[in-house]
Amino acid sequence: MKRMNHRLSLGAVSLAVLALAGCASNAPGVNTPTRPSSSFAVPGLEKPAEVLVDRWGVPHLYAGTLYDAFVAQGFIAARDRLWQMDLWRKRGLGEMAKDFGPAWVESDRAARAVLYRGDMYREWLAYGSDAKRVAEAFTAGVNAYVAQVRAKPALLPTEFALLGYQPATWSPEDVVRIRHHGLTLNFSSEVDRARAFCAGAPGAKADWLRRELDPPVTPKVPEGFDPCNLPVAELRAAYLRATDAPRFTKENTRVGMNAGASSAPVALLPGSAEAIAAKAEQDEAAQGDPTAAYGSNNWVIAPKLTSTGRPILANDPHRAHGAPSLRYMTHLSAPGMDAIGAGEPFLPGLSIGHNGTIAF
């Protein structure tokens, strides 16, 4: 049996969290360790759910319905990573200046320039049939925990007290509108495509030299647009301004009123204009030949070539390391679903993991 450290019960009804300090045993004469547990009322749950937290801190979520699993996931992710999640949302929506001051206006402007602003009705239709309902369930769980910490400020992570602000509530659209945290290749590819077009002779398929297009696509230049006159350095600088991780310093923003007199000054500063420009120039130089090709690294070893007789899948998702980690481990168990793996704390579901049959 897994070693568990904490149990949590959730429900509109209730959600229960259990932590098992040791390995449970039914053997005679063996004492079962104390198992601290808590229960919470979580709006949005249709049936009671249970969360078992193992000794590594991984939550194992057991729900009565598929969507309840995502409500529980949002609640537990917020309980474990609330400040990280709130900062991710604020950064992506361009709302940093609201709480951190005018030093963030330009980075907010850049973030909003690349934020998805299309027709959300059509956008939801482009996903799986239940994608919106999953996002609604997940954000309901996040908001349930946000409501809990607002009612009990002692539960707020220290960062909120230091910076003197409250976590925001989420909408389902927040989950899909923010697309530029660490995902940069589409932006850089558009710039490189324009450079390749201008580097080739008229009518040449220069983009095919940069990257094989499958299925075949013929790039078309919009009427009135001159791809050879792009302010490449300025574009890269703007995108860096929108996506670079926030930096903490001691020079700008004072601590919040609730932080205590002995707290050292804390500031959130975006990169300076000079630093952003310098980094953009470095990135520009690193791009080298705009016709250069790129590869990736996803590979599989067949069962007949492994010692276990099972296939091995290896993949690098190309995401940056950070603290707190970008990855968030979760086990989701509900009717029709039983999988464990890593996702991101601000997104429902799993990105990398396995169920009882396959790895993905």
Where are these regions (language model features)?
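Bacterial N-terminal signal peptides that target proteins for export
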Residues: 2-13
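Residue-level signal for mature regions of secreted extracellular proteins and peptides
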Residues: 16-17, 221
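C-terminal motif of bacterial Sec signal peptides marking the signal peptidase cleavage site
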Residues: 20-22
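Secondary-structure transition/capping motifs at alpha-helix termini
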Residues: 148, 333-337
